């Protein structure tokens, strides 16, 4: 080997293998096998080595890999990307298994032939795995051979040509009570006359062991097998090797003839790992079954397949590019035979012969068992019923082979893959490894690795703590190719339940996770009747292939990219977790109906989503409603009492569709179809908006228009006119409420009469007003105290911001006024506490916060008139019955404003010269009366100072008229603010709230006074009818008309 570096097989550490992983692996190896003098140990006690193509990336860094021949164990299971140099054509292989003598030479550690074989010179001619690694393993097992049964530790796959990387796949071995170990060397197919493998002289085994192996091989191997293998070797192409795993004896399964792949097929990698302490130490006996029937734990994650059977943890890895590289080594002769989906060969490789008979070797020998392969068939995994060990075998289903042809698309795809890199070969080492015992060190080591991988796996953290021994997963780096496969297809995890059923966890492409049950899934594959990804003819999906290459065939009714994992043909098994979804939908629907930790506004959110689960929830929710014998409008009112219909238009329509379906189910004879019910339901909703909406453009819809709009929409015919008239009158007389939540009902100003009569007024404060500015809306507190009431005649003198009111809106109107809280309500009828306020009454309401009431000295057309200037600078004139009543209203309004007006924020600062009046808060103050007085006093002092400063800088006479108007407007504002705060301070000093509680007798007397809203015209002064001259009229006009028109 030293002389031919180009042909030597190189084992190196993976670049991303951490130093800690390397040290742990070395320490473990030394613990299991002891230190080897002169060189580091080559073999792994639990995995062997693997030759994999360079484009394969290891996705499991926590398990280590084997290093270069003679350098020891590697701590990472990453597949190395370094390529091996090709070996010359004259390279020699290993003689195939032919009988007791030749079989021992080529497969076992036969001491006689090993000693007789040539040594290092022959090794230089053959590119073989380092024999030193085999020697180290034999030394470690020599003392344990007497125990009776052997265990597979390593299968060396020697191929004639190697163009890809050499990698070692490490498996953990529990050796505290380990009794046996078996070393199997696979057979390279490349020459007819192959010399025996020379082993070092250090290899020594006991004669009894050699004879035992000879006997078993003589009994199990036939001449036909050798002849067929030799025939395959004559193909002139260095075919790939079949890597086999240990199987149970022939008695447990029976002798079944199988057809294997022809030369050129490449074996797969099967890794086995013993469950901690659960594997029966005795192995599998030929005359009796052993172990207990265990549960099958199967995890598939696109590129990786992991199987735990019983006490064994059997892991089958299919890297993404693994099978593609296998295809590239196939010869043209094997194109037909290599078209079987690669995932069918879960643990054993494809055979080197075109028709090998499956031989189940004796368990004491534990030789690799041939796995069947076929060129056109589908395999079904068979569970061992007689044997307690949960070995899983692939058995040819001949009946299904005759029925199911191989699709042409698969032939074309695989042919393209074979022709892509024609002439290339691979070296693949497939370990078939089983352990019968555990030690404390290995148990702890496995537990640490399992928990670490579980923590980063797709399972939730609950899995790590609830069932740490029931799940296993690898930490998988999401490379772009893996991410693409995750997007294109789903992944599933299988767990074997107690009754033989397996829980299928489906992770769909959109992130949804559902749990189902399956009873016919074993090793990730279904039998002939049930198959994974069944689309049309049962065909198993092409696991581990390139992301762009798929063999899945879809049925006509299936959508491309479907994320359904299982389509069970048996009716009793629900696919994709439908049963669990229905149960969850029922539970959620019940909680929504009972409003269990849900608000009324939350219900529509769960019913109106556009997915299958939301539809299930809506269907279950509607089952709580019985609309039998009810009219459509009654059903709608009953339906909307349970929840609030809110959300987007399409979401609300989905809810109405579910309602229509339920109504038609309860009343199939009322309306012709479900579409007719839905159409009429939407028409009722639109009619309600038209008749009772806040914004009405044009006139409201009439009954005749409603009928005309629905002509011909009931399956081509008209609805009954009597039905439409009844619905129209019902909606017109009573508004249909569908978007009112519990809190909104409490805030609504139009409380029901029953609640008012019972005195159950809500304590929340809503806002009234139709302005677009929310700061100018009026706070409405139904529980506020009533300070004064009586008839008042009102005239609007100026609108908001002092703008002159149009002439048509300036007339006098009489109202029954009620000063309740900080709002002056103006009602058309006399005030009744139990009567609800109408919307018109609320529109006429006036807020008195930061307002000032004063006698209208500049208005003499009518007596007893006072002026009310609000915070938004509206000016209202009110006429009372008498001067005393006028003064009472002035005092009450000013007192309420002084006590309850909240301190304003400072005015905004800007560079504009234009004066802007600051907004004043409409909320009620939180200050006490003393603090309120101090606030008003400080504000009065500030306004006085600002007014004096403003008047100290009058505008120049040469400035523009606009600047003069701005100056006068600000002066008028400051003057008004000064007067207002002076009034507030004086009221609070006199008592404030005490003044509000006085004069109750006067308020009571006002209620009993005039019953007619009209005032006596005889009380008007006679001078009102006397015409004045021009000079007199000028004297009564404001001194600054331009300003007065804006502010008064």
Swiss-Prot record:
Residues 36-45, 311-321, 397-423, 741-758, 1029-1039 have a biased composition (Basic and acidic residues). The keyword Repeat does not apply. Isoform 2 is expressed in epididymis (at protein level). One of its GO terms (molecular function) is guanyl-nucleotide exchange factor activity. Pfam families: PH_9 (PF15410), Sec7 (PF01369). Keywords: Cell membrane, Cell projection, Coiled coil, Guanine-nucleotide releasing factor, Membrane, Phosphoprotein, Synapse. InterPro entries: PH-like_dom_sf, PH_9, PH_domain, Sec7_C_sf, Sec7_dom, Sec7_dom_sf. Residues 36-57, 104-126, 310-342, 364-383, 395-434, 741-769, 999-1048 are annotated as: Disordered. Residues 534-734 form the SEC7 domain. Residues 785-898 form the PH domain. It is found in: Cell membrane; Cell projection, Ruffle membrane; Postsynaptic density. Residues 922-952 form a coiled coil. The modification Phosphoserine is found at residues 76, 770, 1009, 1011-1012, 1014, 1020. One of its GO terms (cellular component) is postsynaptic density. Its main location: membrane. Residues 1011-1022 have a biased composition (Polar residues). GO terms for biological process: regulation of ARF protein signal transduction. Guanine nucleotide exchange factor for ARF6. This is PH and SEC7 domain-containing protein 3. It comes from Homo sapiens (Human). The gene is PSD3.
